[in-house]
Amino acid sequence: MATTSNMFMYSLTIQPPTAITQAILGQFAGTKEQQIVTASGSKLTIHRPDPTQGKITPIYSQDVFGIIRTLAAFRLAGSSKDYIIIGSDSGRITIIEYVPSQNRFNRIHLETFGKSGVRRVVPGQYLAVDPKGRACLIASVEKNKLVYVLNRNSQAELTISSPLEAHKPQTVVFAMTALDVGYENPIFAALEVDYSEADQDPTGRAYEESEKLLVYYELDLGLNHVVRKWADPVDRTASMLFQVPGGADGPSGVLVCAEDNITYRHSNQDAFRVPIPRRIGATENPERKRSIVAGVMHKMRGAFFFLLQTEDGDLFKVTIDMVEDDNGQLTGEVKRLKIKYFDTVPIASSLLILKSGFLYVASEAGNHHFYQFEKLGDDDEETEFNSENFPADLSVPCEPVFFQPRGAENLNLVETLNSLNPLIDSKIVNLNEDDAPQIYTVSGSGARSSFRTLKHGLEVSEIVESELPSVPSAVWTTKLTRADEFDAYIILSFANGTLVLSIGETVEEVTDTGFLSTAPTLAVQQLGEDSLIQVHPRGIRHILADRRVNEWPAPQHRSIVAAATNERQVAVALSSGEIVYFEMDADGTLAEYDERRQMSGTVTCLSLGEVPEGRVRSSFLAVGCDDSTVRILSLDPDSTLENKSVQALTSAPSALNIMSMADSSSGGTTLYLHIGLYSGVYLRTVLDEVTGELSDTRTRFLGAKPVKLFRVSVKGQTAVLALSSRPWLGYSDIQTKGFMLTPLDYVGLEWGWNFSSEQCVEGMVGIQAQNLRIFSIEKLDNNILQESIPLSNTPRRMLKHPEQPLFYVIESDNNVLSPATRARLIEDSKARNGETNVLPPEDFGYPRATGHWASCIQIVDPLDAKAVISTIELEENEAAVSMAAVPFSSQDDETFLVVGTAKDMIVNPPSSAGGFIHIYRFQEDGKELEFIHKTKVEEPPLALLGFQGRLLAGIGSTLRIYDLGMKQLLRKCQAQVVSKTIVGLQTQGSRIVVSDVRESVTYVVYKYQDNILIPFVDDSVSRWTTSTTMVDYETVAGGDKFGNLWLVRCPKKASEEADEDGSGAHLIHERGYLHGAPNRLDLMIHTYTQDIPTSLHKTQLVAGGRDILVWTGFQGTIGMLVPFVSREDVDFFQNLEMQLASQCPPLAGRDHLIYRSYYAPVKGVIDGDLCEMYFLLPNDTKMMIAAELDRSVREIERKISVRYANEGSVLIILMAIPASVCKGL
């Protein structure tokens, strides 16, 4: 397969995966505070929990460009800092540390032990670390185990030994943990099955008799050798191990979790067993056994406990009682094992208990949760079951025990962290008529599923909204003295006057402030140590601390049209075009500079920068004129008001703002001039602090209204508030320091300013029509806003109404009782027992029952009602599997909703009692559905599509065309076009692209005259297709179950032959090639994403931009592929990729090129995620790479962040947000 391509795409992640595969806890910063490290796909993220506010904030995130299989934290004895061990697919063990001063991960050790990739005999699947940090064991699923001794050298640096082998061939490992043995030789416990005899026995008897063993491996530190110390049979269904505290804290050993029971085991102790309690209720099956799927052990002073979770989400508190000696001291001998119901939380992939009294739940599906412990469940009335009442003998079954689930009593939910995992389907539509479309998704599972609206923006918290007596034109806040912490006044300017409000416990009008109330205000500033100034059209009022006022009147027949101020300088522009400059003297008076500067046109705006630390003045004044220019004037005493530079603009400037902001290119701060134009365009340009030259201009269109700019403070950093038809915030990314421009999720404002009070330390005050609004921005780390609407069951497909802003979602849950069955069981229970407790399914899930399906169709209104407005339940154990909106020509092109269902479907191995195609008519503008009829088919119709006024259905391997009849669908044409199962359909004209579950895509042409379907081209590679979209008439983009994205194109000759007029006889009789179609598709691009693509869209994310491909992944990933338009850009990014891969290789040791070529060589794709790692590099590395590429650092960063414009097309991504956060939509 050729790896070069004549087509290149730039692959970029808009939102990284939100599914957390593992989370660990530790003091990674070396302080007493605990941090959480999570693995999401290839992303490693460290989070800071805030116990005072009950919030979790991500600090730093890095793509390791590899599959993170397992994580573990460890601490060397005597140290205060935890290190992180990563088990990945690189065939290497990686030890990293978090460096808080640089806010980055630093790799300490990288030791190779085997082949790369996820293989059953290459260690990396299991990782266990001795609690004292002396050794770690990394193991594979089968055979291989390696022990590394961890120590420190004379320089107190972490060292790692050569690996010690503990291999055992033909042995499968199910779980592994380290024992807590204090400072004795480290011991590791594993659940193993030896399959050597079963492998040689064709009768299967050896397999039936095979035992699962709990095995101890001891590392002898003296002999530097690993021995298999102890092995004992355990329950064959055992699947998890949990470490029991040892030494002075407990008896050591492990908890072995199996189906329906938990057993305490240790080599020198008796076994103790308790059953896992089962739910009791009208809809619960009392015979269903539970298993433990997650858990956590927490040590407190003098005590410890476990929280173990079943597949229902129920948490059980498990404790161990120990025997006491005559003095009442614990002996370390176990007396009993106890278990009781604690609370119910979402099913977790990881559970973490923080020392500050919080529980972190990394959910398997849906949002992650952060709980606070209200109590530990010691004094409640829950029944406690202990091992004294149950036999420890494995051959004797435990009697089942039951508990009654209830609402949360011990845990209080304090924060929910958004997660799109699993993301099933999406649509990209601009329903709000914003400047960018919204992404609508269906995600989650069971009763915790949701329909979500994603849009680009920052979340705003409104504090106050107050109506004013008339419409103000501007608002300011000011302190009374420089030393004040909070603002004292809000000044409102009206067309005929000025209103001053004092800020205190209440906001009220004040009149004795010295401000002129009979004229509108142009600027307000706290000047010097303790004075104020007010600029109005007729002059400048300098209000001293004792309320004395010095007035500077404007010259006769002239007025002030613009003003700029800082704490020491004032500049005003007169209607005659003159600039008058004032500077504060040593005695605190405002002195006018002798000369005035005459500008060539009318001045529209001015700006003075802040006075730098240790300086007495800002060096430059920016002047915007109506001749569409911006001039930089010097304010130095030697060259006051001299012209330093000029920049021509496309429109007259409406606002200017000089401010110093963080700069990713230099690592420090840089002076920028922000420019707003009357045309709605915003520009940001670098202002040289020495020469005053303007360079490196970036542009963005913000809206139809003139842009106004205001300097504000958000989360401790200086930012620019840009107001046009909607508000925007320009700020520095927390991680990369790159400039980001993001819209605010707020009403359009006419004016804005900083606001600081005791109640709102960092806020903003704004004007919207006749309203005064005070608001704040809480988070800068997430700029994708989500609105969520709960759904009933796991969504399978979504569809937008052809005309109305409504969505239709088909949902189905396997092994779940249908609503009708649940209602019947509850009624029966009420008749027998009276009142029945029905638990909310969003917290407790639906009752399970093997072989049952719960399925429905829901209509969602995301704009007006923002809720599900109608639900149609499917009966007779049918499960909805596909959906399409089809206009039928035979019904005057009326559009019907067509839903495909499967009856009595079994997922694995796949089987069903056939399928049905339901027809629904849209009523009430799509808000209701009227059932027409349903047609039985032999297999579930997994793909449906409207095609030339009829219905195209993929049923098994058969492609079929139906028309609408009175009582059922009428079969018009069919052909077997694929070898296995049709899972997707796309069409343009008479061409149909058919996706097969495991044989990629096949192009089929429909010949109308002869009413036949003819496959004429297919793929040379078997791809397990999950989603496809037609990019053009000959090209298809697709994704597969192994995480690949690809683009295939039909050969031009085959395409032309298929479109020739006539019967297509030559296509029918053309000889097939290798049991397939006569022709093969050409592969254009191919890359590996590490997430399963669930939907693909050809769309525009910027109004007027060129088409790009947007894809969504199962784990919540949203990414895009942007086509390159120039070979020069391709060459630049290919060279940058190579430099980055060699200068900063991936953290976990995986080779980047091999990673992106996991199943097939990467072709025609530039990895934008790797390119954006450039932002995170130290400055010296940036400069070294820039020198290799013969470019400047700023030029490279500009290339990465500002995608190319070509022949007048709109910039695809302007000031793109680094992928470490999220891309601008």
From Swiss-Prot:
GO terms for molecular function: U2 snRNA binding. Belongs to the RSE1 family. SUPFAM superfamilies: WD40 repeat-like, YVTN repeat-like/Quinoprotein amine dehydrogenase. One of its GO terms (biological process) is mRNA splicing, via spliceosome. It comes from the Eukaryota. Keywords: mRNA processing, mRNA splicing, Nucleus, Spliceosome. Associated with the spliceosome. Pfam families: Beta-prop_RSE1_1st, Beta-prop_RSE1_2nd, CPSF_A. Involved in pre-mRNA splicing and cell cycle control. It is found in: Nucleus. InterPro entries: Beta-prop_RSE1/DDB1/CPSF1_1st, Cleavage/polyA-sp_fac_asu_C, Quino_amine_DH_bsu, RSE1/DDB1/CFT1/CPSF1, WD40/YVTN_repeat-like_dom_sf, WD40_repeat_dom_sf. The gene is rse1. One of its GO terms (cellular component) is nucleus. This is Pre-mRNA-splicing factor rse1.
